[in-house]
Regions:
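Alpha-helical elements of the RecA-like P-loop NTPase motor core of helicases
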Residues: 21, 86, 126-127
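Short active-site oxyanion
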Residues: 1, 30-33, 74-76, 112-117
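Acidic catalytic patch
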Residues: 66-95, 102-106, 111
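Short glycine/serine- and small hydrophobic-enriched flexible loop segments
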Residues: 45-52, 109
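Short, well-structured N-terminal submotif of metal-dependent ribonuclease cores
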Residues: 1-39, 50-63, 142
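Alpha-helix capping/helix-boundary segments
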Residues: 9-10, 39, 84, 104, ...
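Acidic, PIN/NYN-like endoribonuclease modules and their adjacent C-terminal/linker elements
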Residues: 2, 105-106, 110-142
């Protein structure tokens, strides 16, 4: 299986959340893990925000960022090139997606692989991928 992760499916690998176990199983079951280059900055921003909100200590933030760097090496990256950006713009309008979600949607769609499964905890993104024929894994309902 080629496993595509959006940020909501990746952050629980770095910090303990209710979806951490299902995200870990998805990661472990994937022969190849893929995501948009956007995942890196989106994850770093989410972790920093969690620290600002008091959900993570500074030490936990630093440990999570080190783990981000470690796991990032195991991810095959889909570049955010003109093709992905233009498709994401169309999908944002057509499927009523936020910008980052539209980029994840377009990135997974671009892979066009039969054994691709895209993981997220975002129901709107699950619905969007479903409309495009992309198999999904809901990290909130494994």
């Amino acid at each position: 299986m080629i496993g595509y992760l959006d940020t909501s499916a990746f952050v629980p690998l770095l910090v303990r959340e209710s979806a951490s176990d299902s995200c870990r199983r998805f990661w472990d079951d994937s022969d190849v893990v893929v995501s948009s280059r956007l995942l890196y900055v989106e994850t770093a921003a989410a972790l920093a925000q969690a620290c600002r909100m008091g959900r993570l200590t500074e030490d936990e933030l630093n440990a999570s960022l080190r783990l981000l760097d470690e796991l990032w090496l195991d991810i095959d990256v889909v570049e955010v090139d003109d093709i992905v950006v233009e498709r994401a713009a169309v999908l944002a309008r057509r499927l009523e997606l936020r910008g980052y979600d539209a980029v994840h949607c377009a990135s997974a769609e671009r892979l066009n692989e039969d054994d691709l499964v895209a993981a997220t905890g975002d129901q709107k993104l699950i619905d969007a991928w479903g409309k495009l024929g992309v198999a999904t894994f809901n990290t909130n309902n494994p």
